[in-house]
């Protein structure tokens, strides 16, 4: 068998060409690698030792704003099951500081989100509102959570596939309230119906979960009666604050008479 020799100079030149080609291929691969962020959601109070993962959050919407507070992108997931292992992985290529606003609920369709347009809408123009009908809402609107986070991203085109972790501590903006009303001195008539009405103007929120301007509206719930003729009703109310003149009334639905009114 004859073995053909290769001149050393020729071999070195071929090897150099291969290395140059590999460098080019690697660079092209890196520039095309997916990059983005992994969103994580939890809830933890300042005194809490461990994070909680609210089962009420089954849907999330995340809005990303640049260093000028202008909307650059939006991400969502309608099949959320929060846990320590859950994450919403999104592709995002951006250099500079980003601020994220996350909203969560069992059903975000219960809320009206202001119109958003990428490259135009600012963070200060964001608002989220309860969907009302004739200035009324169900006594148990869907729970609502909000969370804020930020991150600074460098140019990562030559770093391959990188996903930064962004975590949201989700604050609930809804309150569960239970009312029990004892009749004094006479029991409530069994043949009459009663409702509890709460009037407030806490149905609209800005990007950081603060109450924004809103017309007054009513939460209304039918009061149930137990064997001792005590009236009971359960409410889920939006964020409550002192000094907002939140009024609660007990109304005889049969006669239309307002039996009791107080500032909640």
For each feature predicted by the language model, list its residue ranges.
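C-terminal motif of bacterial Sec signal peptides marking the signal peptidase cleavage site
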Residues: 18-21
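A sequence/structural signal for flexible, mid-protein segments enriched
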Residues: 130-229
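Bacterial signal peptide processing site
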Residues: 23-26
């Amino acid at each position: 068998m004859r073995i053909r020799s290769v001149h050393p100079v020729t071999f070195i030149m071929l090897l150099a060409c291969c290395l140059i080609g590999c460098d080019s291929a690697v660079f092209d691969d890196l520039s095309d690698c997916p990059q983005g962020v992994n969103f994580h959601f939890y809830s933890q109070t300042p005194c809490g030792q461990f994070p909680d993962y609210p089962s009420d959050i089954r849907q999330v919407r995340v809005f990303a704003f640049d260093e000028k507070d202008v909307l650059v992108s939006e991400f969502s997931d309608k099949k959320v099951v929060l846990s320590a292992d859950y994450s919403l992985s999104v592709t995002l290529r951006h250099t500079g500081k980003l601020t994220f606003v996350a909203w969560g609920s069992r059903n975000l369709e219960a809320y009206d989100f202001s119109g958003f347009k990428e490259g135009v809408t600012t963070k200060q123009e964001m608002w989220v509102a309860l969907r009302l009908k004739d200035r009324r809402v169900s006594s148990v609107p869907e729970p609502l959570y909000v969370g804020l986070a930020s991150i600074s991203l460098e140019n990562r085109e030559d770093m391959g596939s990188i996903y930064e972790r962004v975590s949201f501590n989700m604050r609930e903006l809804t309150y569960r309230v239970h009312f029990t009303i004892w009749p004094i001195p006479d029991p409530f008539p069994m043949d009459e119906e009663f409702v509890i009405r709460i009037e407030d103007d806490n149905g609209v929120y800005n990007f950081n979960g603060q109450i924004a301007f809103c017309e007054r509206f009513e939460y209304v719930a039918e009061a149930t009666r137990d064997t001792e003729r005590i009236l009971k009703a359960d409410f889920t109310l939006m964020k409550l604050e002192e000094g907002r003149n939140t009024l609660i009334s007990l109304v005889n639905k049969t006669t239309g008479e307002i039996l009791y009114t107080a500032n909640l």
